[in-house]
From Swiss-Prot:
Keyword match Plastid: no
GO cellular component: plasma membrane
GO biological process, one term: potassium ion transmembrane transport
HAMAP family: KdpC
Main location: membrane
Pfam families hit by this protein: KdpC
TM helices/strands, residue ranges: 18-38
Disordered: annotated span: 134-161
Topology within the bilayer: Single-pass membrane protein
Protein name, entry field: Potassium-transporting ATPase KdpC subunit
Keywords, ordered alphabetically: ATP-binding, Cell membrane, Ion transport, Membrane, Nucleotide-binding, Potassium, Potassium transport, Transmembrane, Transmembrane helix, Transport
InterPro entries attached to this UniProt entry: KdpC
Amino acid sequence: MNTSLTNAARLFTAGLRALLVLTVVTGIVYPLVVTGVAQGLFPGKANGSEIKADGKVVGSSLIGQSYNLPLKEGRETPEPDLRWFQGRPANGLGTNTVNTRYELILSGATNRSADDPELLQWVQDAKAAVVRDNSVPGHPVRPEDVPADAVTSSGSGLDPDISPRYADLQVHRVAAKNGLPAERVQELVDEHTTPRTLGFIGEPRVNVLELNIALVELVAPGAGH
């Protein structure tokens, strides 16, 4: 009997020691080491890849934003503010219905098949809107000019980047809405186009938030987003 109690006590003590050691190592030491390394080597990425304008954090280079006009009465969705470059559609985004205390965005894809009738209608409507919104006198946009990323959302619905082709398509509209030379706006796009990583990984891309922040510097004071 005493032997059984002794063995049980020994096992309990060993388990308790293991629990305490692992708690300290994995719950305190490891997080502190990882945090220290991240802050020391990659402080920007460790803090969320924040983007600042006028000394204030205005977003993250990893998360897309919408550039819309105030929601009008009677409408379910706001209209895009055509003074600014627009990102990809966000059809997969949902709303937080579990904890309504916080206004959280639930990211995700539509999970619809390529031949889904509603998805096809979304794409057709989005293409028509891109053609309509970006056609300016002397520079009409044709349906075949519209790239895929202009009418389809990403897997997360929060893609911060667009293709250079989609950015180029918006140049004349942005220039006209802001009273700027199209050539200067095109230069802005070119300056904010990131090439393929290492020259062969991924595709060239344009971060919409960074581009619009640069655009603010060109427009009249007080016209910022």
